[in-house]
A protein has these predicted regions:
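C-terminal-biased regions
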Residues: 1-76
């Protein structure tokens, strides 16, 4: 996995956590739980990608790849 994937998963986790939070406020607990589980899965996937990147990349490579990943998501 790449830092692109880690960034994408983290962005998805933030979205799903926000939806879960909003659903709690609406009293839709089934949907809140569904999105909380999805957020957790995305965070877990991001953690795996980040751990792999730590093993495979130098700090300089990680900085460059991380910047590209974030810019790509912001442009999407």
């Amino acid at each position: 996995m790449s830092l692109d994937e880690a960034a994408r998963q983290l962005k998805m986790a933030v979205h799903d956590a926000q939806v879960a939070f909003d659903c709690v406020g609406l009293g839709d607990l089934d949907r809140a739980q569904e999105h909380a589980v999805t957020a957790r899965a995305a965070v877990d996937a991001a953690e795996v990608a980040l751990a792999r990147a730590q093993q495979d990349m130098s700090p300089e490579e990680a900085q460059a790849a991380g910047e590209r990943a974030v810019v790509a998501l912001e442009d999407a």
